[in-house]
């Protein structure tokens, strides 16, 4: 699904975005917001609130809660925030074509959200692109987070954990040197067995033996089976919510 969303976002940017008015100071494009990654809970609204609380405004949101008219103004943004791997191609297009820098990461947790805010401000002031979720120190090597690459890497950065991207666009820009892109169940089972704590969608629990399993549902994996159990981790105490 990510490849399809990536192509859709990129073509929307190419077809509808036009340079016009001046850049809007501290305005942000949110790119990569899909119901499969951010479900129907409050995460996207929380990202918007977090941006406002940190001195930013929302220019557009690709593609939840924004009209095509709003998305067409994306070149006027000061920076783009890429919250899933399917948004990277369109963010690069906006940077190459209109000079809008981008930052990659989801503001999960308290510590990582502060870093992400600082990186957004740096991107605006210096005009540079930053992979925030790929810049992390693995302090809890016994813990591994599985999921969509940008979200899982962001959560891994908050927790100091390793990341295994089990769904996503194979992109070295997102994953850090300690992260892994994995598509095979047997390989995943082996990886999980090498760690004490595994954070993943509940449908992965049958192949997680001998480790503490922390359920973090993801609609792209388990559909609507666990919708009510999907937490909003934006700018919150992740360890408390996940009972780590």
Give the label of every model feature segment.
Residues 1-244:
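An N-terminal assembly and electron-transfer interface module characteristic of large anaerobic redox
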């Amino acid at each position: 699904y990510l490849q399809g969303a990536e192509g859709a976002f990129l073509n929307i940017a190419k077809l509808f975005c036009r340079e016009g008015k001046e850049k809007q100071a501290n305005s942000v494009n949110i790119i990569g917001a899909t119901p499969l990654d951010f479900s129907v809970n409050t995460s996207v609204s929380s990202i918007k609130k977090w941006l406002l609380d940190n001195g930013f405004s929302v220019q557009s949101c690709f593609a939840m809660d924004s009209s095509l008219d709003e998305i067409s103004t994306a070149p006027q943004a000061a920076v783009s925030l890429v919250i899933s791997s399917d948004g990277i191609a369109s963010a690069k297009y906006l940077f190459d074509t209109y000079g809008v820098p981008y930052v990659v990461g989801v503001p999960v947790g308290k510590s990582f959200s502060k870093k992400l805010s600082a990186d957004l401000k740096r991107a605006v002031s210096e005009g540079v692109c930053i992979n925030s979720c790929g810049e992390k120190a693995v302090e809890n090597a016994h813990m591994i987070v599985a999921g969509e690459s940008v979200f899982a890497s962001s959560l891994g950065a908050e927790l100091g954990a390793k990341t295994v991207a089990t769904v996503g666009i194979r992109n070295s820009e997102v994953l850090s040197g300690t992260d892994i892109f994995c598509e095979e169940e047997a390989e995943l089972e082996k990886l999980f067995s090498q760690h004490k704590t595994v954070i993943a969608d509940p449908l992965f629990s049958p192949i997680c033996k001998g480790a503490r399993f922390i359920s973090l549902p993801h609609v792209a994996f388990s559909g609507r089976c666990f919708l009510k159990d999907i937490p909003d981790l934006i700018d919150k105490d992740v360890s408390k919510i996940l009972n780590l």
